[in-house]
Amino acid sequence: MADSKSGDTEVAHRSSDPSEKRGGWITLPFMLVTLLGMSITSFGWGMNLIVFLIEEFHIKNIAAAQISNVVNGVVNMLPVVAAILADSFFGNIPVISTSTFISLAGTSLLTLITSLNYLMPRPCETGSILCQSPSKLQLGILYVALALVIIGSAGTRFTLAAAGANQYKKPKEQGRFFNWFFLALYIGAITGTTAIVYTQDNASWKLGFGLCAVANLISFIVFIAGVRFYKHDKPLGSPYTSLIRVLVAATMKRKAVISSKDEDYHQYGLGKEAKTYTTMPSKSFRFLNRAALKNKEDLNTSGDSSNNMWRLCSVQEVEDFKAILRLVPLWAAVMFLSTPVAVQMSMTVLQALVMDRKLSPHFEVSAGSLQVIVLVFGCVFIMLNNWIIYPMYQKLIGKPLTPLQQVGIGHVFTILSMAISAVVEAKRLKTVENGGHPMSVLWLVPALVMVGIGEAFHFPANVAVFYGEFPESLKNTATSLTSVVIGISFYLSTAVIDVIQRTTSWLPNDINHGRVDNVYWVVVIGGVLNLGYFLVCSWFYKYRNLKDDDHEQDPKDVKT
């Protein structure tokens, strides 16, 4: 009877908790519209950045490509900072609302820069090859604007993913949300890469950046309007402290003999972690098991565990730390997967600038808009994968494709895209050498299609792996890790381009006198080596939280 009463009391308490009544599918429109607007904004100013720097600020081609890589690197690195702030201090909702406002300030400043002549260098004189360089003041204001839009974009993209997934309790509902999330992300990216970039190239930069600011403003208003429906997860302090504690405790007890008895280990976690602890630490990374091992110094006079949190951790805290360590090799493989793509994106813009971009006498493709091909085919194949390819594979083989298998397929398509790019560039250089008419920009399409298909396989799967396998208290960090990988890859691509430029003659300012095809073959070789490394890592990796039934395609998901 006592148990029954306590159970009824607990149910009554939960039903009276306002946070329990929030969340669910009512939040989906607010989340998706916010994401859609922010995607239009970030891709609108970001995809044409190289062209903007070259044409309006008179920065040299390779230097502009390098600046773009650095900007993209920061955009994708900073989400982990936003994740730390959300996980440890403020929660998702305040971080997202603040970030959208900061982004709005940045897009407004970009609009102002292109509206006032004295904030940009004077246009080049007709027929002159010498153009006025930007002043320090002009560059300074430009960098402030870029810093604001970078912070705003970084604080929303993957924090929105974690905030949206937090609105649902069941893993399958979270999976369905991620499908909608990536669909909205790609639709926004396509819109920004086509409509906004076309406006910048054919109307004015002022109008293009102004439209970015409008989309940003709509995102901010819609997100704030939905606050009363969101489920707010209160941060329980820094989850990173427990990770450091595991290292400290294991080091302090490094001479202790590891026990094989479960009663010798401290079993109790805190908060959400208390319900998921294991009775015995796993055998992998056994030296860390000492952090949860109880000895005389860890017991107080009453025989209970000591209150010294730096000497004794729970088994669950140890296992959480191990889970992160197991993911590090896979994380590195994803990083080296994204590096060739970052190189390719920069080189593709430079190639397009010296190719025939006219599709008709009255229509010319923007060099920055070519990335839309990646987004379109990524969007299409995300839908095909979830609604046709994955269910068909499951029906034929009898078991679903695991996330790591999906990532492996993405590796293959990425390598194929680099090889195609190398062949096309060799043909283009041959045409230039023979004095023929510039090749059509459509020759770049097949490689970009392969990149898009590859992203449809590996991008959502990587997010699913990190989100599913990371500890409960680090879910924001989990979703941001994919972005961090992309950010590091942009820095690595900048380093690769810099090394090639210093050691070879393949990348002059005029790529018609270079060998960009050789650059592509270098990244093809790197991609093949990385694929081999990934296959070894994935072969030995054992899923911690994700089970086979989590990968299975639900008919309801297909309809949705």
Curated annotation (Swiss-Prot):
GO MF terms here are:
chloride transmembrane transporter activity
Q: What SUPFAM superfamilies does this protein's entry cite?
A: MFS general substrate transporter (SSF103473)
Biological processes per GO annotation: cellular response to salt; chloride transport; nitrate assimilation; oligopeptide transport
| InterPro entries in UniProt | MFS_trans_sf, POT_fam, PTR2_symporter_CS
- Cite the residue spans of the region called Disordered: 1-20
Protein's UniProt name: Protein NRT1/ PTR FAMILY 2.5
Identify the PROSITE patterns for this entry: PTR2_1 (PS01022)
Q: What does this protein do?
A: Transporter involved in a passive nitrate efflux.
- One of the Pfam families matching this protein, by short name: PTR2
Q: In which tissues is it expressed?
A: Expressed in the root epidermis or cortex.
PANTHER family recorded for this chain?
OLIGOPEPTIDE TRANSPORTER-RELATED
Q: What protein family is recorded?
A: Belongs to the major facilitator superfamily. Proton-dependent oligopeptide transporter (POT/PTR) (TC 2.A.17) family.
Regarding the membrane, this protein is recorded as:
Multi-pass membrane protein
